[in-house]
């Protein structure tokens, strides 16, 4: 086995945690909160079910987080006009201001985080990440555990 095999997951995890922690410290906003606000912003209006599917966490977790955002005045929740089982979520003016503020800070953060990396290196990194994600999403990927 090649030497990088023993460190690739640990290095990837450390880089992810460092970037998430750095983002949260720099912007003052938790990354999960940012993901929710940004998704609602990008969709305009969406259901909590849509958010659950997009983010990939359980519905209860999304509901709790959306309730907090609603209580803080960042989002508004309303029953879906055609299906009362669903709840629509949209940004309030305060939520839109928060998204705009964090988008500006995020751009600065990403610029600093990627400092010293060429455009070619970043493109290669993104290709590798996409390939890893594609491999992990293959239906037969977990068959390696059966061997």
For each of these PLM feature ranges, what is it?
Residues 1-27:
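N-terminal leader segment of winged-helix/HTH proteins
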